[in-house]
């Protein structure tokens, strides 16, 4: 691997001159600059990123810690973050934690050693222990995005209550009165608020919620599949079902298909998140859209602002508002 000394020797100049050409820190005569650039090209020389970062106090890199990059919703946010980082001249180090506290700690230590310019933390839920751990790395500019009510983090307000209400209202407006729900784990903020939106819409329409049609599971396709199979053991079935995320809806549709039941002819289904794949479900899924692109971009912009002003004291926590929108496709049937 070529060194700066090799470049200087080939160009017939000092290493200091090579450094000035690379970093544009001093005027260098045109012919000298061309000789240096020619030597760099011939030798395929690349300046040491570590050495440069020590000199200019930046690595142009950002660390991102997420619960998982496998879930389509998070994957689409990560894609948006990576793309926006790239356009701003930053590399992204992605770390999956799988909600393992030891992994969180190890990833934070590794990213600190790599001298990342900032940290973006995006997990589905936070414990006090995890928040305390993050605070111990407070010398690094950081954006901790939280869907919950914690006071010591930035907040993503995805208006899940409104989204749950909007989804249920659409089913009601299509004539459905027997409506079930496959919700997430109700001890978690996002699932609970979507369920509360469902409750509100049912209450407004003076419709009774059948407790047997309220099924709880994780935001995974397997849980949607298992919940639907439990629902199908009942004598009376709902005409419509609100699945509180799209991958649960996929699992639910799979279970229906195995029983030779059709969507929406035998049961209407509405999802939530509008992941990219949802338009290719069979049938294409009616769902609630959240802008993952906007969320990723805004989170990066907040972090870059903190990196720029990191020496100016404590930063105020930020809030990102994501407005839910109804996307009508083919999985809900009107029975009016």
Swiss-Prot record:
InterPro entries: HTH_LacI, LacI/GalR-like_sensor, Lambda_DNA-bd_dom_sf, Peripla_BP_I, Tscrpt_reg_HTH_PurR. GO terms for molecular function: DNA-binding transcription factor activity; transcription cis-regulatory region binding. Gene3D superfamilies: 3.40.50.2300, lambda repressor-like DNA-binding domains. The keyword DNA-binding applies. Hypoxanthine binds at residues 73, 188, 190, 219, 273. SUPFAM superfamilies: lambda repressor-like DNA-binding domains, Periplasmic binding protein-like I. GO terms for biological process: negative regulation of DNA-templated transcription; purine nucleotide biosynthetic process. The keyword Transcription applies. PROSITE patterns: HTH_LACI_1, HTH_LACI_2. SMART domains: HTH_LACI. Pathway: Purine metabolism; purine nucleotide biosynthesis [regulation]. Residues 4-23, 48-56 bind DNA. Keywords: DNA-binding, Purine biosynthesis, Repressor, Transcription, Transcription regulation. Residues 2-56 form the HTH lacI-type domain. NCBIfam families: PRK10703.1. PANTHER family: HTH-TYPE TRANSCRIPTIONAL REPRESSOR PURR-RELATED, LACI-RELATED TRANSCRIPTIONAL REPRESSOR. HAMAP family: HTH_type_PurR. Is the main repressor of the genes involved in the de novo synthesis of purine nucleotides, regulating purB, purC, purEK, purF, purHD, purL, purMN and guaBA expression. PurR is allosterically activated to bind its cognate DNA by binding the purine corepressors, hypoxanthine or guanine, thereby effecting transcription repression. Homodimer. Consists of two structural and functional domains: an N-terminal DNA-binding domain, approximately the first 60 residues, and a larger C-terminal domain, approximately 280 residues, which imparts the function of corepressor binding and oligomerization. This is HTH-type transcriptional repressor PurR. It comes from Haemophilus influenzae (strain PittGG). The lineage of its organism: Bacteria, Pseudomonadati, Pseudomonadota, Gammaproteobacteria, Pasteurellales.
